[in-house]
């Protein structure tokens, strides 16, 4: 299923009452509800949002990223593909340029500090050696001292887009290899040091082992603003939807003109539908769901009880 079909399903659910979003499967383990906290308890920590496509992060994790930035994180965006395929009626070159401009607007709206473009060809990432992508990510994790990542679930079920699962598997491997002194030791001559990524928030388009649900109510407007910067991609979704409605001899007046008003309406309905559906299960207005992997708690408890000053 293409991402635009996911949006189309969300919009159809909102407009026509037809639920079409893929359900996520909760794990048997306890699900942690993560809520906003006051102050900046995460000051000094670094997160990286790593996705192949510009709109992946805003849709699946935009609220949680905004929440953590508000709580003190410094954030970076790593885009692995060049997004050359995601437009409705533009040429390849126009598509790359449009999405590149939109990426700059997203960076500004999100509060992320910097973007790193790896520039691999969209829909062709399964041609690549994953060790190459992994090596580049190891370098960035060490350079930026990344503590927390957001990316696609490397074990997400029924994922048809190779860019998604190739990126996800490279991210997962790089997270722990970046802490090894024998992995890419030439980095150390340049002043870098081993650094493992301690925490992962994985999202998926299909069924997933969910163990962390984040209350994004306070950050929902920021998430909405971030998705609205993805104008080239959202325009693609709207035009696709309009074309399918024409085949049924239907139209939605608010979406008929592909302009800022249509983009605002489309993103509002799509995100309200999807994020409310997640939140409703847990008594929240809006929520995002993840498979979360963090530091081993028993060892953390042991350290907190037994550490002494040097």
Where are these regions (language model features)?
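Structural signal for conserved beta-strand scaffold positions within catalytic alpha/beta enzyme cores
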Residues: 49, 79, 117-119, 151, ...
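C-terminal segment of classical bacterial N-terminal signal peptides
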Residues: 17-22
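C-terminal accessory domains and tails appended to enzymatic cores
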Residues: 28-34, 39-43, 180-193, 205-310
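Residues on a specific face of well-ordered alpha-helices
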Residues: 101, 105, 168-169, 173, ...
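Histidine-centered active-site/metal-ligand motif
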Residues: 53, 161-164, 230
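Internal alpha/beta domain cores that form substrate/cofactor-binding pockets in large enzymes
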Residues: 76, 115-201
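Active-site rim/loop-helix segments in enzyme catalytic domains that contact anionic ligands
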Residues: 3, 7-9, 26-144, 299
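Sec-dependent signal peptide hydrophobic core
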Residues: 10-15
């Amino acid at each position: 299923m293409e991402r635009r079909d996911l949006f189309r399903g969300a919009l159809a659910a909102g407009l026509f009452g037809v639920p079409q979003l893929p359900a996520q499967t909760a794990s048997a383990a306890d699900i942690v509800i993560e809520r906003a906290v006051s102050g900046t308890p995460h000051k000094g920590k670094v997160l990286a949002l790593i996705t192949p496509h510009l709109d992946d992060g805003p849709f699946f994790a935009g609220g949680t990223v905004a929440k953590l930035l508000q709580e003190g994180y410094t954030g970076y965006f790593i885009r692995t593909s060049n997004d050359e395929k995601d437009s409705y009626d533009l040429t390849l070159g126009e598509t790359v340029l449009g999405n590149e401009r939109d990426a700059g607007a997203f960076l500004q709206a999100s509060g992320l500090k910097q973007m790193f473009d790896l520039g691999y060809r969209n829909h062709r990432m399964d041609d690549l050696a994953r060790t190459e992508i992994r090596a580049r990510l190891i370098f960035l994790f060490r350079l930026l001292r990344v503590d927390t990542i957001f990316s696609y679930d490397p074990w997400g079920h029924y994922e048809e887009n190779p860019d998604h699962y190739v990126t996800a598997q490279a991210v997962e491997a790089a997270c722990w290899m970046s802490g090894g002194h024998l992995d890419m030791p030439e980095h150390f001559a340049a002043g870098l040091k081993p650094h493992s990524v301690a925490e992962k928030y994985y999202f998926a388009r299909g069924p997933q082992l969910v163990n962390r649900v984040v209350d994004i109510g306070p950050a929902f407007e920021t998430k909405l603003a971030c998705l609205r910067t993805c104008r080239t991609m959202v325009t693609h979704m709207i035009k696709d939807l309009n074309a399918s409605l024409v085949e049924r001899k239907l139209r939605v007046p608010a979406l008929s003109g592909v302009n800022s008003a249509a983009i605002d309406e489309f993103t509002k309905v799509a995100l309200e539908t999807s994020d409310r559906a997640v939140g409703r299960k847990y008594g929240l207005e809006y929520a995002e769901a993840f498979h979360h992997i963090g530091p081993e708690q028993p060892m953390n408890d042991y350290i907190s009880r037994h550490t002494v000053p040097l």
